[in-house]
Amino acid sequence: MAEEEAKGLDYIPEIVLKKRKNRDELAFIRKKQLELGNSGKKKKKVSDIKRPEDFVHEFRAKEVDMIRMKQRVKRPKSSPPPVKSDLVFIIRIQGKNDMHPKTKRILNNLQLKSVFTGVFAKATDSLFQKLLKVQPYVTYGYPNDKSVKDLIYKKGCTIIEGNPVPLTDNNIIEQALGEHKILGIEDLVNEIARVGDHFREVMRFLGPLKLNKPVADVLHRKKQVFSEGGDTGNREDKINDLISKMN
């Protein structure tokens, strides 16, 4: 009897266990493909289907993102550098599935729903608090008049019926902002550059600016702040160099 129990506890080679694991994963993927096929959706590649451990990894990454956000906000810092301009230009440079929902909400609130989009904003304490919370995903600074003009002329658009429309016709601008004496693209540029009385109305009219993906070596894919050799955070007037390379 003891011999039979001993036989039941025979050692299972590691390679056999790995094959079982791979077989189970393949069965899971095939099940997902079958579910997608039955629902009438377009079939996905095997590589596109998430395995159970992928969901665990994504969940943990989101939790880490939230913890680090709280640490950035609570961390005592020296006095921040003085604000050099009333105008800030913000570029989203990172972030896909590894961010906490709160981070995503802040980025959406800033109209930065996609990587390599940029927006103008008025420099306020509230804005810088938001930027601190999403610091690993954005870089920002103070655009000069040339950068503002180049961005609006090359990338400026408004959203009409859900679609971006380039600002190639002054009539579009006049119809939307004529009551504020903004009659064309030059008036629009001036209102943004000096953060005029109707800056808020202009920002509601202006859609997010879709920038070009930077070439190699422009960004280092590092989440450290710019002042420490990374990509993120406040570049101050150095933002103009990045704008020229992405516009």
Curated annotation (Swiss-Prot):
UniProt entry keywords in alphabetical sequence: Ribonucleoprotein, Ribosomal protein
One of the Pfam families matching this protein, by short name: Ribosomal_L30_N
Disulfide-bond pairs as recorded: none
Cellular compartments per GO CC: cytosolic large ribosomal subunit; nucleolus
CDD domains to which the protein is assigned, alphabetical: Ribosomal_L7_archeal_euk
Matching InterPro entries: Ribo_uL30_ferredoxin-like_sf (IPR036919), Ribosomal_uL30 (IPR039699), Ribosomal_uL30_euk (IPR005998), Ribosomal_uL30_euk_arc (IPR035808), Ribosomal_uL30_ferredoxin-like (IPR016082), Ribosomal_uL30_N_euk (IPR012988)
GO molecular function terms listed in the Swiss-Prot or TrEMBL record: RNA binding; structural constituent of ribosome
GO biological process, one term: maturation of LSU-rRNA from tricistronic rRNA transcript (SSU-rRNA, 5.8S rRNA, LSU-rRNA)
Leader sequence segment: none
Record family assignment: Belongs to the universal ribosomal protein uL30 family.
PANTHER family assigned to the protein according to its UniProt record, in alphabetical order: 60S RIBOSOMAL PROTEIN L7, LARGE RIBOSOMAL SUBUNIT PROTEIN UL30Z
Protein name (record): Large ribosomal subunit protein uL30z
Source organism: Arabidopsis thaliana (Mouse-ear cress)
Lineage: Eukaryota, Viridiplantae, Streptophyta, Embryophyta, Tracheophyta
Gene transcribed to yield this protein: RPL7A
